[in-house]
């Protein structure tokens, strides 16, 4: 975990945190509660209010208490808006995601999102990302790859002719 890290949450992450308290435990492994801060920007709040009806103060309070970090509301400035327009012209990102991505670039923060398309575009424009849907697979892949270093031994199948005939054991009940 790095010190003084800032993160920007996408809409899907905020919704997952509110709807699934266990999801936060996974994120806490990657967010240092002492040296990190989290941004939720204007676009994310608009999407959440439109789709789910969460109030801004309720959402920010819930995120702060769940994650244990400082959570800040970020406005979409004119500079961010012009960067979003640039991203719309030069990438395949849609308007809402363009604003979220432009905000992330402007704040030099790490984007946390479950949106695979947004993540791939963010990586292509040089933004660091975290996809919590793939965090749990890292250790499993490491364990699988670790086993490749061993030399595999070939085992030949034993033919039926080599096997010894076996008597079938039957159990009988004797009563007196």
Task: Indicate residue ranges for each PLM-predicted region.
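A generic structural signal for short hydrophobic patches within well-formed alpha-helices
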Residues: 14, 23, 45, 118-119
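Short, hinge-like loop/turn segments at secondary-structure boundaries
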Residues: 55-59, 91, 129-131, 148
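Acidic, PIN/NYN-like endoribonuclease modules and their adjacent C-terminal/linker elements
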Residues: 2, 116-176
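Short coil/turn segments at beta-strand junctions that form active-site/ligand-binding loops
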Residues: 3-6, 36, 107-109, 155-160
């Amino acid at each position: 975990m790095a010190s003084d890290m800032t993160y920007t949450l996408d809409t899907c992450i905020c919704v997952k945190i509110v709807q699934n308290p266990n999801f936060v435990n996974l994120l806490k492994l990657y967010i240092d509660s002492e040296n990190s801060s989290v941004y939720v920007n204007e676009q994310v709040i608009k999407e959440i209010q439109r789709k789910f009806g969460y109030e801004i103060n309720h959402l920010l309070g819930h995120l702060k208490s769940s994650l244990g970090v400082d959570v800040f509301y970020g406005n979409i400035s004119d500079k961010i808006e012009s960067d979003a327009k640039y991203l719309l012209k030069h990438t395949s990102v849609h308007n809402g995601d363009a604003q979220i991505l432009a905000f992330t670039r402007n704040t030099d923060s790490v984007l946390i999102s479950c949106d695979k398309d947004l993540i791939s575009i963010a990586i292509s424009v040089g933004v660091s990302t975290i996809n919590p849907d793939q965090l749990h697979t890292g250790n499993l892949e490491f364990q699988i790859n670790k086993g490749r270093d061993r030399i595999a031994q070939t085992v030949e199948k034993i033919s039926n002719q080599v096997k010894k005939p076996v008597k079938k054991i039957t159990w009988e009940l004797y009563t007196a």
